[in-house]
C-alpha cells in the first residue's frame, strides 16, 4: 500500500476528530535531515504493504513547529497509531529501550505495535 505524505492541516484533521469515518491509521513523523528516518523508509513501506486495512501516512516535522509538544513526543522518527472518528484514539509507539542502530525502531516492534492496536481498535 502506498504511503501518503500529509501536511499540517491534514494531520490536525486526522488527530482532531474531523475524519468522521472509522479507519486505522499509522503516521510516521520524520525529519528531512534525520538519517534514521530515511533508513526507516523501506521498512515502513514494507509494513504498509503487509497491512492493506490500514492507511499509512508520513508527516515531515520540519513543517510541524510546536507539534511535538502538542502531541507529547520528542524527536523523530516517531510512529503513532490512530483509530479515526469523532473521538479518535491516538497511541504513540514507545521509544525502544535498545534502539535499532539503523532505523531506531526494530521492524518487529513496529509490526507488533500495529497488530496490537488493530486488535484493540
Predicted regions and their residues:
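CheY-like receiver
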Residues: 14-18, 67, 113
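Thiol-based oxidoreductase modules, predominantly thioredoxin-like and allied folds used
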Residues: 4-8, 29-30, 41, 45-66
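Structural micro-motif
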Residues: 65, 71-83
